[in-house]
Structure formats: C-alpha cells, structure tokens
Curated annotation (Swiss-Prot):
Entry GO terms, CC: extracellular region; membrane; nematocyst; other organism cell membrane
Residue span of region Trp-rich region, which is important for the binding to lipid membrane: 141-156
Swiss-Prot/TrEMBL keywords: Cytolysis, Ion transport, Membrane, Nematocyst, Secreted, Signal, Target cell membrane, Target membrane, Toxin, Transmembrane, Transport
S-S bonds: none
Residues involved in phosphocholine binding: 123, 141, 143, 176-177
Localization terms from the record: Secreted; Nematocyst; Target cell membrane
Quaternary context: Octamer or nonamer in membranes. Monomer in the soluble state.
Protein name: Echotoxin-2
Source taxon at top rank: Eukaryota
Site (Important in the initial contact with the lipid membrane): 149
Gene3D superfamilies referenced in this protein's UniProt entry, alphabetically: Cytolysin/lectin (2.60.270.20)
C-alpha cells in the first residue's frame, strides 16, 4: 500500500514538473496526464526490481538483539546506476548488512545497529549517481533516548564534481546541525510526532525521503529524475504501453538510443581488452 502511494506521488510529480514545451518529454507527459493515476502507479510499481538486500536487511534488523536499529531502503527511478556506496557511521554503531549499488529501477537496503550502552546510531550514506560526478547523500539519526532526542532524516546531493565523501562525520555534522552550503544541498526533517516525507529538488533530480518515529527505525528514499527521459529504461518501457502513438514513438527512440549507446560501450570495452 505504501509503495502504491509512493508511485502515485512520483507520477504526479513527473506530470506536474515536466514542461509541455519539451518535444519528446512533453509528448509523453501530454499522453500520461490523460491516464488514471492508479493505472500509472500500478505500471510503475511493476517496473521495479526488489534486490535480495531488502529482505536480508529487514531480517537482520528484526532479529537483532540491539534495541536501536535502522534500515535504509533506496529506490532508484533514474536511468543511472547508483554506485560506490559509502556508509559513514558517525558514532560507534555498526553495520548489520552492507550497502550495495542500486541499479536503475531497483530497490536495495542495508541495516545498522547501535553500539553497546546508551547509544543510538547515526551517520550518512552516499552513492555516486551514474556519470553525473556527484553523490546522492542521506543523513539519518536514530537516538537511544526519545526523552531528549528524535529521529532525524536529511536527503540531498553534493555539487557536480564532488564525488568523494568528506571525513567520517563532516557531512553528518553539516546535515544534522547546519544548512546547505556550496558543497552539499539538502533538506532535513524531524520524525517525532510527524512522519511526513521530505523533498529535495534541484534542476535535474528529486529525492523523496521518509522515516518512522520508533527505535526500530526505517528510512525510505526515492531518487527520481525531473525529466521523463531520464527515467530508467524498464520504467519507460512500462510507460510506452500506456502512451499514445506519439508518446510511444518518443520512448522507442530514446530506448533505441540507449541500446546503441550500450552497444558502443561494450564494443569499446572489448577493443580495450584486445589491445
């Protein structure tokens, strides 16, 4: 149910954010805007592949003897691979499972736990987004004591050209205590009474994040493009089945372009191996 709601949010965002003036993208959006949102959401959900890490992270957190755990689940709706994950736990907590690359149209998770004693677990995790040379960054804080502290979440991106994380707690300190700067832009939310999602957006990408307000914390983040043509290929394929003639043609052209690009990449890699 929650994932259906999320898909509806994504569909509405794509339709509202894309400009009709865009030739190919505008043609697709004009077609999709006439289709019931529930139909679009169902199609988009079937395009997502759930990685094995989702079940293993949930199981690890559930079976853990530690009173504070945190599972972070990431959905990648873009055409880019989310790669080179870096988890930086800013206190003495530890990993229960490891963060993985997230393929286009894929869901992956990992889990963490608190250290011994009256401690929670907090830090950042980030991935390089394809060839954009920048990182998607998530900050979380799952405290031990709810009398004085709350769960907190921030989502954002590093600037283009900044693809290497700072030291262990630098990004956490900025995203928990501070504000966006020249290196990282983000939004932050407190999860004590409210569990409403937060939204980060720039000219190319949007990240939606949400967190619960219990000690078995769970973070969900969805990375999605502003432009329809930056959606993952499997999502575009699902949309192709729903689009009108002009929309189908635009999607088919984009998918063909990507297929040719991938063929050229493989050919180049083979040539390099044979040298």
């Amino acid at each position: 149910m929650k994932r259906n709601i999320l898909a509806l949010v994504v569909v509405v965002a794509l339709i509202s954010q894309s400009r009709p003036a865009e030739s190919a993208g505008g043609t697709i959006i004009a077609t999709l805007s006439k289709i019931p949102l529930s139909t679009l959401a169902s199609a988009l959900n079937t395009a997502l592949e759930t990685g094995a890490s989702v079940a293993s992270a949930a199981a690890a957190a559930t079976s853990s003897d530690y009173s504070v755990t945190c599972v972070i689940e990431v959905e990648n709706w873009t055409k880019h691979l989310m790669k080179y994950p870096v988890v930086q736990i800013a206190n003495s907590g530890g990993l229960l499972t490891v963060a993985k690359n997230v393929l286009p149209a894929e869901i992956q998770s990992f889990a963490m736990r608190k250290a011994w004693g009256a401690n929670g677990v907090y830090g950042t995790v980030s991935w390089v987004l394809g060839q954009t040379n920048r990182r998607v960054v998530i900050m979380w804080s799952a405290p031990y004591n709810f009398d004085f502290y709350s769960n907190w979440l921030a989502v954002g991106m590093s600037r283009p050209g900044l693809a290497v994380p700072s030291s262990r707690s630098t990004w956490f300190d900025l995203m928990y205590y501070g504000n966006s700067n020249a290196d990282i832009s983000f939004v932050r939310g407190e999860y004590y009474h409210s569990v409403d999602p937060i939204y980060f957006k720039n000219s190319e990408w949007e990240i939606e994040g949400s967190m619960n307000n219990i000690h078995k914390a769970r973070v969900r983040a969805t990375v999605k493009p502003i432009k329809t043509m930056d959606l993952a290929s499997s999502i575009l394929t699902k949309l192709e089945a729903l689009a009108g003639a002009n929309g189908k043609r635009a999607i088919q052209q984009e998918l063909a372009r990507r297929a040719e690009e991938e063929k050229q990449r493989k050919r180049k890699a083979l040539d390099e191996m044979l040298k």
